[in-house]
Amino acid sequence: MKVVLDTNALMMPVELDVRLFDELDRIMPPGYELFVPEAVLNELATLSSGRGKEATAASVGADLAERATPVEHEAAYADDAVLEVARELGATVVTNDRPLRDRLFEAGIPVIGLRGHNTLERNEP
């Protein structure tokens, strides 16, 4: 099974105290593969150049993204890229971005999002 990581998913460990990879291991079948769109990597790099908690979260997110396979795409914006890559790969997306989640559901793409304080849950469209 393939999983695409969104920018805010990679920032969850710092911002929301979510043990991202432990949670994915808990809810996904063994052998799942992680992918990250290039636009997400670019967004993390931009955010990490700032100051404060968001910059720290983005910096940690960029480090965590190294566990995923980078994917090139046509879309210019990170959310569009996540949708494009998920469609192409037939993947589930990890995001806590409500507008993106709604777009993914409309496209028939499953979403893993926050449930409760720091637990992830997979939802079908």
Predicted features by range, described:
Residues A39-P125:
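Nuclease catalytic cores that cleave nucleic-acid phosphodiester bonds
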Residues M1-R67:
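Domain-level signal for Mg2+-assisted phosphodiester chemistry and nucleotide/NA-binding surfaces
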